[in-house]
Regions:
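Proteins enriched for Cys/Gly/acidic motifs involved in redox and nucleic-acid/cofactor modification
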Residues: 19-21, 112, 126-154
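Zn2+-dependent cytidine deaminase-like catalytic core
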Residues: 31-130, 215, 241, 246-248, ...
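A short, flexible N-terminal coil/short beta segment enriched in small residues
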Residues: 10-14, 29, 34-41, 130-143, ...
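Enzymes that bind and transform nitrogen-containing heteroaromatic metabolites
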Residues: 2-17, 22-24, 63, 80, ...
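Short, conserved alpha-helical segments within structured domains
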Residues: 25-27, 127-130, 295
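A broad detector of short, well-ordered amphipathic alpha-helices
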Residues: 8, 12-15, 39, 50-53, ...
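Short beta-strand scaffold segments in enzyme catalytic cores
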Residues: 26-35, 153-154, 358
Length: 375
C-alpha cells in the first residue's frame, strides 16, 4: 500500500465517528510497520479515547520504528483524555504523517513541536484537503465558538417548498428523506421556526435506529409554542431549547415549559425579535457546534440576513407545484438588484433516488442584519 492509501484508510476510519464525536473532530489513525498495518483506530465518541490511543490499543506487535498516519494533528494537552503526543513518543513511533492542522489554541502546532523535540519525524499537510473535509463543523466552532449552520430544504423544480395551501408532504422521495435523517444524526442541533411548529407539529428527531437525535431548537419570539405540541411533550426524551424575545405575559408559560423539560433562551434585539447572532453565541456556549436549519421561508431569510448560514443544501424533486401563492425557500422582501444576491459556490451535486441534492457554500460578504422577522 502507498502513503495515500494508508491516509485514505485513516479517513475511512474517522468517518465511523460521524455524529458521535461532536463537538470534537472526527479523527482516524493507522499505524504501519514494514509495509503492514499493525494497528488502527478512530475517535468513537466525545469524551472517549482519541484515534491515536485507540490505534495503539489495537497494536498486534511493537510500534517501535513504525509510522502513524493521522488525519488531524495529535493533541498535546490534558482534557477529557490524556495527550496523544505522549502515547506516540512512549511507543517509540519514528514518524508521524498528519493531514489537517488543529486550529484549537491548545494544540495549534504545539503537538508537532512536542513530537519533533522528542526526535520524531513529522510530515504535515499530507492530503490536507481530503482530511479538512472531515471536520468543517469543528474548524468553524473551535475558532468562532458558534455553530456551523447549514440551511436545508426540499423544493420542486419550480422552487416551491409547499403548495398554496401550505401542504408539503411529501415533496421528495423516500431515499432523499432517509438522507435527511442521516443529516440530522450528523448535527448537534436542528432549528425551526414557530411557524413550522404551528403548521406541521413536527418531532424534529431521528427515526432510524442506531442514530442519535439532535438538540431541537425552536425560534419563537412571542413564546407561542403550544404545551401540547409534539416537541414540548417529548422534551424529557429529546433535549429541546426554545428561543424567545418578548417577555410580555410569558412568566407562567416559561414555568410550564421548564416543568416539561424545555430549556429557554431569552435573546431579544432592539425590536423585541430574536437576535440570531446572539442566539448562535448562546448555543455555542452550550457546546452546540453545528445546526441543521430546517426552517420555512421566513426563518431562512432571517438567517441569511443575519449572516449565520455557512452552507445551503437543497433537495430538488422532479415535480412542479406552480402558483404565485406557493411557498418558496427564502421569503422576506428580497433584494432589489441581482448584484445584492447572496452568492453561493457549488460544492457538490448528486442524485439521491429520484431527487437531486445541491450543496453550496455561502460566499463571505458584508452582512447587514442580525434580527429575525416576526416568527
Amino acid at each position: 500500500m502507498t502513503d495515500q492509501e494508508y491516509m485514505l484508510r485513516a479517513i475511512q476510519l474517522a468517518k465511523k465517528g460521524e455524529g458521535w464525536t461532536n463537538p470534537n473532530p472526527m479523527v482516524g489513525a493507522v499505524i504501519v510497520k514494514d509495509g503492514r498495518i499493525i494497528g488502527e483506530g478512530y475517535h468513537k465518541k466525545y469524551g472517549e479515547l482519541h484515534a491515536e490511543r485507540n490505534a495503539i490499543a489495537s497494536l498486534t506487535e511493537s510500534a517501535e520504528g513504525a509510522v502513524i498516519y493521522v488525519t488531524l494533528e495529535p493533541c498535546c494537552h490534558h482534557g477529557k483524555t490524556p495527550p496523544c503526543t505522549e502515547a506516540i513518543i512512549e511507543q517509540k513511533i519514528r514518524k508521524v504523517v498528519i493531514g489537517s492542522r488543529d486550529p484549537n489554541p491548545k494544540v495549534a502546532g504545539k503537538g508537532v513541536q512536542m513530537l519533533r523535540e522528542a526526535g520524531v519525524t513529522v510530515v504535515e499537510d499530507f492530503m490536507r484537503e481530503e482530511c479538512d473535509q472531515l471536520n468543517p463543523f469543528f474548524f468553524h466552532y473551535i475558532t468562532t465558538k458558534t455553530p456551523y449552520v447549514v440551511m436545508k430544504y426540499a423544493m420542486t423544480l419550480d422552487g416551491k417548498i409547499a403548495t398554496k395551501t401550505g401542504a408539503s408532504k411529501w415533496i421528495t422521495g423516500e431515499a432523499a428523506r432517509k438522507e435527511v435523517q442521516h443529516m440530522r444524526h450528523q448535527y448537534m442541533g436542528i432549528m425551526a421556526g414557530i411557524g413550522t411548529v404551528l403548521a406541521d407539529d413536527p418531532m424534529l428527531n431521528v427515526r432510524v435506529e442506531g442514530w442519535k437525535s439532535p438538540v431541537r431548537i425552536v425560534c419563537d419570539s412571542k413564546l407561542r409554542i403550544p404545551p401540547d405540541s409534539q416537541i414540548v411533550k417529548s422534551a424529557e426524551k429529546y433535549r429541546t431549547i426554545v428561543a424567545y424575545a418578548d417577555q410580555k405575559n410569558t412568566e407562567e408559560k416559561i414555568k410550564i415549559l421548564h416543568t416539561m423539560g424545555v430549556e429557554t433562551i431569552y435573546c431579544p434585539d432592539e425590536k423585541n425579535q430574536i437576535d440570531l447572532k446572539k442566539l448562535m453565541t448562546d448555543l455555542g456556549s452550550k457546546g452546540i457546534d453545528s445546526i441543521l436549519l430546517e426552517g420555512g421561508g421566513t426563518l431562512n431569510d432571517s438567517a441569511l440576513r443575519a449572516g449565520i448560514v455557512k452552507e445551503v443544501q437543497a433537495f430538488v424533486a422532479p415535480k412542479l407545484f406552480g402558483g404565485v401563492a406557493g411557498k418558496t425557500p427564502v421569503e422576506g422582501i428580497g433584494v432589489e438588484f441581482p448584484s445584492e444576491a447572496v452568492e453561493l459556490k457549488y460544492t457538490d451535486i448528486c442524485q439521491i433516488g429520484e431527487d437531486i441534492r445541491i450543496r453550496c457554500q455561502v460566499c463571505e460578504k458584508k452582512q447587514e442584519e442580525s434580527c429575525l422577522q416576526e416568527l
